Amino acid sequence: MNIYLIRHTSVDVPAGYAYGQTDVLLRPSFEEEAEKVKESLSGLTFDKVWCSPLTRCVRLASYCGYPDAVREDRVKELNFGEWEMKSWEDLSSDPRSEAWFADWINIRTPNGESLKDQYDRVSSFLDETRKSGMQDVCIFAHGGVLTCARVYAGEYGIEEAFKNVPSYGEIIKLSFD
């Protein structure tokens, strides 16, 4: 089985902000970026296509020719809870951030998720997908989802996750027996 995972294009959010599951706008360069993704997918056919229900993924899937991609909550970005749309600089003064920065794999953000939570939901989806009998599938998702999928595939350990966040519009292919 081949699973193609595509990160959405760049977002119109200042650098250094936790935007996670917030439905943010895409940059004005969307069409230019999306065209590159679409070209990279030309010639490929998929048994099924999914996407995160967040607009930044739905829009890219639609642009690439998959307006009916199945919306899947398990491929949403990490939920930063109360920290959504706050700058990392501001969060450093939040007393709860010390514990999270010390163990972001296991500690949840306030009213949000830990990386382990996200990994578990992405893994659940990938397990189900692999059991489906399909050969080639595509998922339009987020940097954190692609990172969790690579951990799932054994490319690196979860502790290396934030060192390996894919670029906007990046496509990764994971192959399983």
What are these regions (language model features)?
Residues I6-P67:
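Active-site-proximal alpha-helix that buttresses catalytic centers in soluble enzyme cores
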Residues S42-T45, T129-Q135:
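Glycine-rich phosphate-binding loop signature in dinucleotide/nucleotide-binding domains
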Residues C51-S52, D120, F140-A141:
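Short beta-strand scaffold positions
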Residues Q135-L146:
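A glycine-rich beta-strand to alpha-helix segment
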Residues Y156-D177:
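Domain-level recognition of soluble alpha/beta enzyme cores
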